């Protein structure tokens, strides 16, 4: 659990450093398969809220869930998550 939290925090910090306004940016891509295999967006939102995040917006981008939020530390982030596993997805630098 602690390792997952540390990895998640590192991803969030990296996302914060590389994020600026984006839509269909290609910053992240997910081999997510058919939408019938995707987990509900609400499940991701609930998991993030349980971590203390304040969700501003969630949308689809590059086959991933793209989340705009404020973390439990008050940091604004743009983060990507795989829609089947809900795992954080690394992003490409612009």
Language-model segments: which ranges?
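Sequence contexts marking disulfide-bonded cysteines in secreted/extracellular proteins
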Residues: 29-31, 63-65
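Short beta-strand
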Residues: 57-59
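Residue-level signal for well-ordered, solvent-exposed loop/turn and beta-edge residues enriched
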Residues: 75, 86-87
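A short, surface-exposed interaction/processing loop segment used at functional sites
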Residues: 87-94
């Amino acid at each position: 659990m602690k390792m997952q939290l540390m990895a998640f925090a590192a991803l969030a910090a990296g996302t914060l450093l590389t994020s600026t306004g984006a839509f269909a940016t290609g910053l992240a891509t997910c081999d997510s398969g058919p939408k019938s295999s995707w987990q509900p967006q609400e499940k991701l939102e609930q998991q993030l809220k349980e971590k203390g995040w304040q969700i501003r917006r969630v949308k689809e981008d590059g086959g991933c869930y793209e989340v705009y939020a404020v973390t439990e530390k008050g940091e604004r982030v743009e983060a990507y998550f795989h829609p089947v596993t809900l795992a954080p997805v690394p992003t490409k630098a612009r």
